[in-house]
Amino acid sequence: MGKYFGTSGIREIVNEKLTPELALNVGRALGTYLGGGTVVVGRDTRTSGGMLKRALISGLLSTGVDVIDIGLAPTPLTGFAIKLYGADAGVTITASHNPSQYNGIKVWQPNGMAYTPEMENQLEAIIDSGNFRKAAWNEIGKVRTADPKEEYLREALRIVHLDNSYTVVIDSGNGAGSILSPYLQRELGNKVISLNSHPSGFFVRELEPNAKSLAMLAKTVKAMKADVGIAHDGDADRIGVVDDQGNFVEYEVMLSLIAGYMLRKFGKGKVVTTVDAGFALDDYIKPLGGEVLRTRVGDVAVADELAKHGGIFGGEPSGTWIIPQWNLTPDGIFAGALVLEMIDRLGPISELAKEVPRYVTLRAKIPCPNGKKARAMEIIAHEALKSFDYERLIDIDGVRIENGDWWILFRPSGTEPIMRITLEAHTEEKAKELMEKAERLVKEAIARA
């Protein structure tokens, strides 16, 4: 069977693996799977977005499914529109933080949660079978256009409130967030300074929000004496934050801060994160009545655990946050509003960040052909159990071993031909010692696979 979906939908180089033909067949497969109904479709700013969107919509229509085309839309707006219009599914044409030559297809459930791997497997099986539903001439689906931005803003303002006004610099990265994120901040009463705010498929900066890609945002925050800088990737499902001193706030720190604020705002509860998240989150939220649950990497796994356990907040140490009181779609735009509310209630991020415990985190990528990943992971798991003196093992996504003052995660990438090593320790010396040992173990495992 063909494997089209990865850890975050389909994501490939356009007109190589991701073609209009594949987009057409995904539309046909989704329509066949649904057996009718209505699907919301939106896309980010990539140059290939219109081509792929039209092909996908054609596939949906051919099965008798109606389409609500919301045009250029960040992923959070697509998730919101699914619930707003009572649709049976949603599709975003996006490659999120990948470079311009990539695009992707991500499918969403009626509750705003991404399709699970099991659901994606069913779509793949339909594509491979070629057994698509074909509507009669008088039952072919219809398309209507819609613009849910005003409703999104109105609903967001019912949940988030500020007592004061702040200066906010927003770097939308030329992505789809530029049509919504600055406007939400303005509606909250803030003074907004926009960077890279014109929608374009020719991205000015690297789309993944990190210290390097947000150097201009950091300089602008400092020069304008702004209270905070907020950045998004291509579809604005992620958020990156620069504090009032012009410093990029590490993902682990922001994850801890916003989880703590959610506990203060909504009361004690469970916080869901992924196996690659460090100890800081546990240590920071425990005194606030928070309990950490870890799951597989990916927003769909986080959303699934939130729904199962009635969690109060979910997030990954990549700037992907899910606020279940709002939606089960990762939403960097609404997250930005919550960051401002946190500042309004608790004070500057530069001061709040001092309260979050700091550990030494190291990451490594080891080249590994996709065909070797499964066998290499078997060897890694076996050897890691023998080589490290650990107290706890978590194997829900890769292999994570923990001791009292360190942890290591061995995990194959779901989107690249690499093995990832992530580790954390209390001291730099210990972290380097662990990484040296871990890298040697992984390279030997790949050679033997």
From Swiss-Prot:
Binding site for Mg(2+): S96, D233, D235, D237
EC number: 5.4.2.10
Cofactor note: Binds 1 Mg(2+) ion per subunit.
Any one GO MF annotation of this record: magnesium ion binding
Pfam families, per the entry: PGM_PMM_I, PGM_PMM_II, PGM_PMM_III, PGM_PMM_IV
One GO biological process term: carbohydrate metabolic process
Top enzyme class: isomerase
Keyword Glycosyltransferase assigned: no
Modified residues (Phosphoserine): S96
Cofactor(s) in the UniProt record: Mg(2+)
Keywords annotated in UniProt: Isomerase, Magnesium, Metal-binding, Phosphoprotein
InterPro entries: A-D-PHexomutase_a/b/a-I, A-D-PHexomutase_a/b/a-I/II/III, A-D-PHexomutase_a/b/a-II, A-D-PHexomutase_a/b/a-III, A-D-PHexomutase_C, A-D-PHexomutase_C_sf, A-D-PHexomutase_CS, Alpha-D-phosphohexomutase_SF
Post-translational modification: Activated by phosphorylation.
PROSITE patterns: PGM_PMM
Reaction(s) catalysed (UniProt annotation): alpha-D-glucosamine 1-phosphate = D-glucosamine 6-phosphate
Catalytic residues as annotated in Swiss-Prot or TrEMBL: S96 (phosphoserine intermediate)
Family: Belongs to the phosphohexose mutase family.
UniProt function note: Catalyzes the conversion of glucosamine-6-phosphate to glucosamine-1-phosphate.
Protein name per its UniProtKB record: Probable phosphoglucosamine mutase
Organism encoding this protein: Thermococcus onnurineus (strain NA1)
Gene symbol of the encoding locus: glmM
